[in-house]
Structures are given as C-alpha cells and as structure tokens.
Curated annotation (Swiss-Prot):
Residues 241-270, 702-734 are annotated as: Disordered. The keyword Transcription does not apply. Residues 241-255 have a biased composition (Basic and acidic residues). Keywords: Coiled coil, Leucine-rich repeat, Repeat. Residues 600-680 form a coiled coil. InterPro entries: CEP72-like (IPR055320), Leu-rich_rpt (IPR001611), LRR_dom_sf (IPR032675). LRR repeats lie at residues 51-72, 73-94. This is Leucine-rich repeat-containing protein 36. Residues 107-146 form the LRRCT domain. It comes from Homo sapiens. Residues 722-732 have a biased composition (Polar residues).
Length: 754
C-alpha cells in the first residue's frame, strides 16, 4: 500500500527535485502520485510559491484544497484522479484570479454531483478549459441561469449542497421502489459478459432467500478492506458511500486488472446493487484477484458492501445459459445444476471444483417443484423484449456464445449427434405416459419438460440443444408442431405405445421442415462454426467490441440462422404418411383461401391508388395556383398584412368614423343656426322697406306720432305684406329695430312750423 503524505515545502522540494531554486522563481511544478506514496493534503505548502503558473497534482489522494489560495498566479491546475469529495472544495479555487485550465476527472465530486460542471463554470469565471473540454459560451449561460436564483448569498454553497443531497435521496428512493417492484414481479436480472455474450439470470426469490456464503479459503478474514481485492465497480461504489472518505484505495479505477471485464446492466445498477465481475484466464499471476478467484467462471453478486454470494456456473469452455427454476431454492442448486449439465461430463471430463467453494447455507423452501425446469430458450423468450433492439442484440450474443462454445469441436459434435440419435431410437414407453391435455393445454411448456428425469441426460440434451436456436420464431415453430401432432402415436399406454423417435422423425416430413439427417448436417455445422470463428477473429477488438459491431452481427446472424433453417434436402421416409397427407391438405386449403383473397386485395389497392393519384393531382394544382398568386403579389408590390395589423387599422378607422359623425352633427346644428339668421335678416329688410314706403307717403305737415301711433305701428308689424308676423312674434329684435328706425326718421324730419 502506498504511503500517504501531508505536503509541506520540504516535501515539495524533495518531490519536485528543487535544490537551490527560490520558491518565488518556480513557475511549473509536477507532483504526480506513485506507488511509493501519494499526497493526502497540501496544507500551507504553497505559501511561498507566488509565481507558480502550472501545477500537476494528478494521481494522488487529495481530499481538501485548503491552502490552494496562496497560488495567486496559477493558470493550469491538474487534479486528475484524486479524491475531491464535494463542491465545497471546488469553491476553494474561486480566489485564483487567473485560473484557465482545470482537470478534476475521476474524482468523487464528478460522479456524485450532477451539477458539478455548471457549478465549476459558474464559480470560476476565468475558466477556459474544464476536464480537457473547452468551456462553451452556452455552458456559461446555462450555469448563470441555473444558479442565478441563489445569488451571491452566504448560504450559496449550503443551498447547492442541499439540492444535490435532495437529488441523491430522490434517486435512492427511486432505487428502493424499483427494487421492490422487481422482487414483486419475480423478474430476473440479466448480466452479460461482454467477452462471451453470456446471459446469467438471477431469480429474485433465490437472492432474497439466500442468507450468506462462506468466505473462500486463504483469502484472509471476512472484514478485510474492499480496496485490496476489488469485486467490481458497483461493489466499490457502494462501499465508498458507506465507508469513510479517506479510504481511497477502493476507487474503481485503482488496482484494476486490464484483463478483468466488468459488465453493467442496461438499467442503473447503482439503484439495485447487483454486480457481475468476470476475470479472464490470462490475468497476471501476482494480482490479488487471482488469489481470491481461482476459477475464471466465478461471479460475485452483491446487494450490500458486506454481503456477497458465489455461484459456480461451470467450465467457461462448455457453459451454456441456464436458469434456475423459479420455485427451486438455492439448497437444490447443485442437484439441478448437475442434472442440466450432466451431458458435459459425458463429453469431456469436467474439472473438479476447487476446495474454496463452500456449500450454501440457506433457508429450506416448502414449495419445491423439481418436475419442470426452464431451458435457455424459454428464458430468453420470456426475458427478452422482441420490440427492443437491445434485447434482440443481447439475445443474438447469447445464442452466439451458446453455439460457438457448445459446437466448437467437430469431433465432439459427431459423438454427440450419434448419442442423440441412439437415445431417440432406443426411447421406450418406460418413461411414462402423459395425458393429451398435458401438452395441448399448455403450448408454452415444451415437450421436453414432461420427460426430464435424473437418468435421461441425453433426452434432455436434445431438447436443450434445440432450445438454443438464435431465432425465437424457429423455436416456437417447432414447439407448435410438437403440440399439434396427433398425440395418440407418441403418448399411449405402456403396452401399445410406439417409440418417440417415430413421432420426432415424422416432423421431417411436414411442410416447411426440411431438416437433413444428422450425418448430413454435421459437415454443414462444422463449416458454419469455422466461418463464425473466423468472423470473430476478424472483428474482435477488445472487450465488448462485437456487441455493437454491425459488420459482425449481420453475417453472424445469417450463419446462426443457417443452422436453424438449413438448406432443403430430400425428406426422410415418414412412418405416418396419413398425417403427412393431412398436413399437405390443410396447407393446400390455406393456400387456396389466401389465393381467393389476393384478387380482392389487388382491386382495393388499385382503387386506393387511383384515389391517391387524383388527390395528388388536385393538391399539385392548388400548389401551382398559390405559387402564381404569390408571384403576382410580389411583382405588384403588395404586401400581405397580418391579422394584427388589419385589426389595428380597423380600430383606427372606427375611431375616425366616430369623430366624423360628431363633426357632422355639429355642422347640422350650425346649418340650422345660419338658416334662422338668414330668415331674421330678410324680415328686417322687408320691414325696413315697408317703413320707408310709409314715410314717403305721409304728408309733410302731419305729425309723425299721429301718423304712426303705437297701436298702428303694432298693427303694421303684425300685418306684413308677406303675411308673416316677423316684428311681433317671430323676431322681437327686429321689431325693436324697426321702432328705432321709425323714430330716427321722425326725428330727422323737420317740423312744419319751422
């Protein structure tokens, strides 16, 4: 274990090979950690390095940046692969006014705080590059928008930490709820080795019921620190949250074998706490993982940092996917396992288990059902989602592994085929009779699940091999044929039943099932496997490189499908020709019915095509008209007005109309007034003329008062020559004016005596 140092100025001189240089003259310094020792804290070591511009503290165990504020000229700071725990430590870099480049990758703060990058960009305004990525202007705006509501208050960091903790707690609660849903639905977790394409299902019931597994011999005490023997990324992350932050050797990137592949589930394994870790055969002999895991096929499943369960899944060169029955506890795991993989013992001697493997101590299960077991094909059919591209990809990878590892040796394959054919020919009714409704009632249960017994491993093998087909369609097709057979030929009483091989042999005579004999298929299988291995060697580029390689997946799928649906050959002689004839007749009737429906469909499609073409023509004409109208409007300079503009203009015109209406009313009143004035003027003129005429008619010696007494003047005023009483009634002003004029005339006339 590397030593942990608290840095001081003397340590800086020793590590940086500074002998006679003054601290003020140092501009660049590299203090990377090594296996000899790692820096734990910096303290006041940089108090005198005022002109330091570049500092490299990568690959250390620094947990606090207290004391970094003395580097007032620092521009480039590398804290790669340290143990900076929180944003509070990142905020200690704020007093550095010239900091332009910062590297905090592989620190806990990067994994735990989702807003870490935004916080760093918001806090360090002069930052130009963060974690070897240029800080974009959009990130600055996003950070400012995200943290603007907190402002520059004193509780800024507390509020940021609080929001981060709330997000973490929310994720934990979501993880617990999802874990409970998984256990309630009795769904299996699937972990896949990216090197092998191996599916390993974990039934939740067995995981929940199992208490613990004894520790392997020779690996020390159970309370040994997890940092010495890492069990995988997820185990270390769980342990990091629960153990003190100064235990830094347990980091997921430290002491990690380059040949060890750690596989993550498509879902977030952080919430569930399950992890599968595989170790390659070529790992270093001095690595501690080899002492803990002596066999390459042991995986560790962890739900807690202190609890692990080891399951032996057999030799990696011959293992194929297998699922424990949902009702079988882990106490019967060895028996089920030995029954399923019993054929491996006949093909080649399986290496004995290491003494490090201990027996399981688990609670007994009261409802054990050992009469049925699920094959890999059933498992993949039930667990993989056909609508998901990821599920199809993983299923293809699993089938690839099963085919390459089980059929990789042509000589072994020939031996297996011969044994299978012999076992099918020698199959007798001693296995027991099965009612017809046992198969017809449940088509999803394959026929092989009704014939499993501890002494018939070959029989299980033929059906297990058939279930390993990479095409779920082909698998269901064969099972449906088995279920639709006339079961009276295969399941009768022990006295009059025929061998099952005759029923299976009749399958080759059915329409669409042209599987050649085993002796004819063997060279084809060997050729396909050889081509598949060459394809793997061609495209292999490290762990998991084949899972998303389309150049590999396409040809591999075609090769595997050629095993399931081989080239048609001459059909075998069937033992039941009447069944074959019935099948052909049914097929012929179906084809005739389909042929009758085809013309009707063609007519309807033609009619639809005609309607679509007509609609297309109409729409094209409308588009042409619209284009012409738009061109004309552009040429004439007319600009289309929007609805808002038209509404605004309408309001303006309405106001103008109202104003004009008011002005019109005023003009009408003015016209009435002018008409009244004109009438008054005419009355005055007439009255004046009449009075002048009267004055001219009167004798000179006659008195004016006698000539025009008030009564007479009043009478004259009432009897106008025009028949209007203008002086007396309609115009008082004119009446007074007339009197004034008459009086003036009388005054101006000379007296007769004078």
């Amino acid at each position: 274990m590397a030593e942990q140092w608290e840095l001081d100025e003397e340590g800086i001189r020793r590590l940086g090979a500074l002998t006679l240089e003054q601290p003020e003259l140092v501009e660049s310094l590299s203090l990377q950690g090594s296996y000899a020792g790692k820096i734990h804290s910096i303290g006041d070591a940089f108090r005198n390095f005022k002109n330091l511009r570049s500092l490299d503290l990568s690959r250390n165990l620094i947990t606090s940046l207290k004391g970094i504020q003395y580097l007032c000229s620092l521009q480039d700071l590398n804290l790669y692969y340290n143990n900076i725990p929180s944003l509070v430590e990142v905020s200690r870099l704020q007093p550095l006014p010239f900091l332009k480049e910062l590297d905090l990758r592989l620190n806990p703060v990067v994994r735990k705080d989702t807003d870490y990058r935004l916080f760093a960009v918001y806090t360090l305004q002069t930052l130009e590059k963060l974690d070897d990525r240029t800080v974009r202007e959009g990130e600055r705006k996003a950070a400012k928008l995200h943290f603007s509501q907190l402002g520059n208050s004193e509780n800024f960091l507390l509020e940021v930490e609080k929001s981060s903790r709330e997000k973490t707690m929310k994720n934990c609660v979501t993880g617990e709820s999802s874990a409970s849903k998984v256990s309630a639905n009795v769904d299996s977790r699937i972990e896949m080795d990216s090197n092998k394409g191996l599916f390993i299902p974990f039934p939740n019931r067995e995981i929940k019921d199992s208490l613990s597994t004894s520790a392997t011999q020779g690996n020390g005490t159970r309370d040994q620190k997890l940092d010495t023997f890492p069990l995988g990324t997820q185990t270390q992350e769980v342990a990091r949250r629960e153990m003190p932050s100064d235990n830094h050797q347990e980091d997921e990137f430290r002491h990690y074998s380059p040949r060890q592949s750690t596989v993550r589930s498509p879902e977030k394994m952080t919430r569930e706490g399950y992890q599968v870790s595989f170790l390659d055969n070529k790992s270093s002999g001095s690595s501690p993982e080899k002492e803990l895991i002596p066999k390459p096929d042991t995986f560790h499943l962890t739900h807690d940092a202190s609890l692990s369960k080891c399951l032996d899944v057999g030799d990696s060169s011959q293992i194929h996917p297998y699922q424990l029955p949902s009702d079988v506890g882990l106490e019967n795991y060895d028996s089920c396992y030995s029954q399923t993989l019993s054929l491996h013992g006949s093909l080649g001697k399986r290496p004995q288990r290491s003494k490090n493997y201990q027996e399981y101590s688990i609670k007994p299960s009261n409802d054990i059902k050992t009469t049925a077991s699920h094959s890999c094909g059933d498992l993949l059919t039930s667990l993989s989602n056909p609508d998901s591209s990821t599920g199809r990809l993983l299923k293809l990878s699993s089938d690839l592994y099963a085919t390459t590892h089980f059929n990789s040796d042509p000589a072994v394959l020939v031996n297996v085929e011969q044994q299978l054919s012999t076992s099918l020919d020698d199959l007798t009714p001693a296995h027991g009779s099965v009612p017809n409704n046992a198969v017809l009632g449940n088509r999803t249960t394959p026929l092989r699940t009704l014939l499993l017994s501890p002494g018939t491993s070959e029989h299980r093998k033929i059906f297990t091999k058939r279930s390993l087909s990479p095409s779920k369609r082909g698998f269901k097709w064969k099972d449906n044929i088995l279920a639709n057979l006339n079961l009276k030929h295969g399941f009768q009483d022990a006295t009059g039943s025929e061998p099952l091989s005759s029923d299976l042999g009749s399958l080759h005579g059915l329409a669409g099932n042209h599987s050649p004999p085993i002796s004819a298929r063997t060279p084809h299988v060997a050729t396909v496997l050889r081509q598949l291995l060459e394809l793997v060697d061609k495209h292999w580029n490290g762990s998991g490189s084949l899972l998303l390689n389309k150049k590999f997946l396409g040809p591999a799928r075609d090769l595997l499908l050629s095993l399931v649906v081989p080239a048609p050959s001459q059909p075998r002689c069937c033992s039941h020709p009447e069944d074959t004839m019935k099948a052909f007749c049914r097929r012929e009737l179906e084809l005739k019915e389909a042929a009758q429906l085809v013309p009707n469909d063609m007519e309807s499609l033609k009619q639809k095509l005609v309607r679509v073409l007509e609609e297309n023509l109409i729409l094209s004409e409308k588009i042409q008209q619209l284009e012409e109208g738009a061109a004309i409007s552009i040429v004439s300079g007319q600009q289309s007005h929007t609805y808002d503009d038209l509404l605004h203009k309408n309001q303006q015109l309405t106001m103008q109309v109202a104003c004009l209406n008011q002005e019109l009313a005023q003009l009408k009143k003015l016209e009435k007034t002018v008409a009244i004035l004109h009438e008054s003027q005419r009355s005055l003129v007439v009255t004046n003329e009449y009075l002048l005429q009267q004055l001219n008619k009167e004798p000179k010696g006659y008195s004016g008062k006698a000539l025009l007494p008030p009564e007479k003047g009043h009478h004259l005023g009432r009897s106008s020559p025009f028949g209007k009483s203008t002086l007396s009634s309609s115009s008082p002003v004119a009446h007074e004016t007339g009197q004034y004029l008459i009086q003036s005339v009388l005054d101006a006339a000379p007296e007769p005596g004078l």
